[in-house]
Amino acid sequence: MKLQQLRYVVKVAECGSITEASRRLFVSQPSITASIRDLENEMGVHIFERTNKGVIVSEEGETFLGYARQVLDQADLLEGKYKGASEQVPHFSVSCQHYSFAVNAFVDVIREFDAARYDFTLREEQTHEIIEDVAHMKSELGILYLSEHNREVIERMLVTNELVFEGLFCATPHVFVCADHPLADRSSVTLEDLEDYPFLSYEQGSYNSFYYSEELTSTFERRKNIRVRDRATLFNLAMGLNGYTVCSGVISHELNGPGIISIPLDVDEYMEIGIITRKNTTLTRYGRAYIDAIRQHI
């Protein structure tokens, strides 16, 4: 097995086509095909399924690619250290639910290391995507929450994917509403107070059950529901429709502006927000710095 073979399979997976990977790598298509075939035979793994539209990664190929990315990242770090720091391009990826403190911490990491070149990724995603990203090593760590409602299901998924959860802090539920919302002057609100207002939540795709929901009180029935995919849309709807969402209460006025406020929600529940990582994996300096930065924002 050679590093070049691993680079080929990762690029083909990204492109979904050997032809496109060949064009981007400036390597002939037959050379890439032969190299991947040799790698599959040597490792005894079937990485790609061939279709008339290109290639797709097989189930066992996803696992292989996760390890391949980790090997390539480590090789890049090694080369950068001993072949000249100027050639090193740091890589760091985080997958998270829609938390402003996660964005602020990401900014802090970039400012702390302030490299001339870097390749960092922050993905705000659906819950199951966060777990898959960390399991397949697309992200070094993920951020999500556990509660009495979802803990059993999420922890089972983590065990299945050889991931571990480390709690960072526990939060009582709050609601985000616009600053001129009719309930904005309340010291706290109840679910009954909110009945007449649209409930805003993050869509979870085919995993759209309360086990994967980002909103702690998703098990309650609402008359008005709106699901979105991104934070900006959710806040725009909150301001335009007097909608609300349930959250941890940690808010960043630097990111969200003064138009959104947080009010305690009067329910007897809590959420434990933490990070997920691969079992027995040592975090990079960027991962460690990111966790330290999060602790400064909560």
List the predicted regions and their residue ranges.
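Short helix-boundary/capping micro-motifs
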Residues: 10-28
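A short LG(V/I)-centered, amphipathic sequence patch enriched
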Residues: 40-57
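Alpha-helical linker/hinge and terminal dimerization helices associated
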Residues: 42-43, 64-86, 290
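Central regulatory/effector-binding core of bacterial HTH transcription factors
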Residues: 89-153
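Hydrophobic hinge/microswitch elements
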Residues: 135-139, 145, 204-261
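Flexible hinge/capping segments at coil-to-helix
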Residues: 157-173, 177-199
